[in-house]
Amino acid sequence: MEKELDKDKKIAVLIDADNVSEKYIKFIIDEISNHGTPTYKRIYGDWTKPNLASWKAVLLNYSITPIQQYSYTTGKNATDAALIIDAMDILYSGRVDGFCIVSSDSDFTRLAARLREAGKYVIGMGEKKTPTPFIAACEKFKYLEVLASSTTESTEPETPETKREVGQTAGAGGAGTNVTEISEAVRTIITEISDDDGWASLGEVGSVLNKRYPDFDTRNYGFHKLTPFLSSLGCFEIRSRKTSNPNVTNKYIRNQQPKVEPEEAAAPRPRKRKPRKKKRAPSSGTPS
């Protein structure tokens, strides 16, 4: 459902060490592999600071190049400036098809917008505290906490009861847009693109939804696929239709239709009772 680059596309991964923990690196690299091939893998920070000492082993394991950037003065973020300059150099080199900016900092909002203006696919990654402007500037945004948790939970079987509970609660106060807003957005999209019978291609619905909500990811709500997530909401009908290829089926979705109750059997009309004829009293006396 989600727009993704081909696996052979080249992506520059630029990481802000000041705003990302080393525990997320594995999940970042794994997620990028779903979108393309990371050709540039750079991380920016002042590596003379003790708080970044724990990064060394991780950077070696994942072949990530650390870029040293001293803090020239207090209150100025030289790391951000170095990352932005490198991103523009890579852009003009013409060697990549997309960028992944990993940070929870809104300072990269304009950079993401500029890269998209140049026709590049931009993926943002950050923690749940990431400001909305940076999220909106990216074509897609992934929450690091969700990437980490979805990997550890992927081996656990999902029961219908679990899905329904997660679908109703996730997103509220957590990662991503509130599930109620997503549900209403899906209803609107279906109305806009459906056929005369109200059915719309599930793939098209997912594509439009991803464009309107850059941070939309079914994993935010405890699901790995769009179909079970939408089914858990209980307000949509989903059907599969066969194609000319027996191995391929297309899925369609429409807003749940009101149930038509069968008409109650008409009650038999009450029979009209004929008025009883009054008996004539016998005449007295003899006829003349």
Q: What is the meaning of each model-derived region?
A:
Residues 1-86, 91-92, 113, 121:
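Domain-level signal for Mg2+-assisted phosphodiester chemistry and nucleotide/NA-binding surfaces
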Residues 13, 21-24, 28, 51, ...:
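Helical mechanochemical/support elements of P-loop NTPase systems and associated helical scaffolds
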Residues 17, 71-72, 104, 127-128, ...:
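Short, ordered loop/turn segments at secondary-structure junctions
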Residues 44, 97-104, 111, 115, ...:
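Acidic beta-strand-to-loop metal/phosphate-binding motif
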Residues 112-146:
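VWA/integrin I-like adhesion module and closely mimicked acidic/polar interface patches used
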